[in-house]
Amino acid sequence: MRIILLGAPGAGKGTQAQFIMEKYGIPQISTGDMLRAAVKAQSELGRQAKALMDAGKLVTDELVIALAKERIKQDHCRNGFLLDGFPRTLPQADAMKEVGIAVDYVLEFAVPDSLIIDRIVGRRVHAPSGRVYHVKFNPPKQEGKDDVTGELLTSRKDDQEDTVRKRLVEYHQQTAPLIDYYRKEADAGNTRYFTLDGTRNVSEVSAELAAILG
């Protein structure tokens, strides 16, 4: 079972990725994880990636694809894998296809930008414990304070509205074209494409995923 998750930041991909990993026993593969593992293992690809990063340069699509190909050959990916945040661009998707990385399911989590902004901007965290609240959807018992310690809650820098809006613009420019790409791939019989309504509660989305994936 080889799966790609698509959706804007805040669309709920991370939560559902966890559900898929636990239910189906397949590993999640992210670009960051692949790079860190390759650098740590000091493989040839890892050394190339480290040289680029040390020089302050972006790791090339070719190198990322090569890392992905190397990673999915490993034993723990024998039953499949879950790609989150990759491919991010059309050239990456094309390159994946060219090197023979097949995908069984592409799952898109659709959520309007206005709700994503609401979801992210309203997040509050208790930094020492990692507990997360939301001013509207999961408020603390006492406004602005952690339920357990009573300490003040804070907003992450990445959760500021202007930052979220910038990330959404970037998503629509770079990643949204993948939606058309994979819909066409599904029409051609190369994968199966499903759009899930990410505005629903977590358990409803998980139930639909279980019905799709079997």
UniProtKB/Swiss-Prot annotation:
GO terms for molecular function: adenylate kinase activity; ATP binding. One of its GO terms (biological process) is AMP salvage. It comes from the Bacteria. It is an enzyme of class 2 (transferase). Its EC number is 2.7.4.3. ATP binds at G10, A11, G12, K13, G14, T15, R123, V132, Y133, R200. It is found in: Cytoplasm. It catalyses: AMP + ATP = 2 ADP. Pathway: Purine metabolism; AMP biosynthesis via salvage pathway; AMP from ADP: step 1/1. Pfam families: ADK (PF00406), ADK_lid (PF05191). Residues 122-159 are annotated as: LID. AMP binds at T31, R36, K57, L58, V59, G85, F86, P87, R88, Q92, R156, R167. PROSITE patterns: ADENYLATE_KINASE. Residues 30-59 are annotated as: NMP. GO terms for cellular component: cytoplasm. HAMAP family: Adenylate_kinase_Adk. Catalyzes the reversible transfer of the terminal phosphate group between ATP and AMP. Plays an important role in cellular energy homeostasis and in adenine nucleotide metabolism. Monomer. Belongs to the adenylate kinase family. This is Adenylate kinase. The gene is adk.
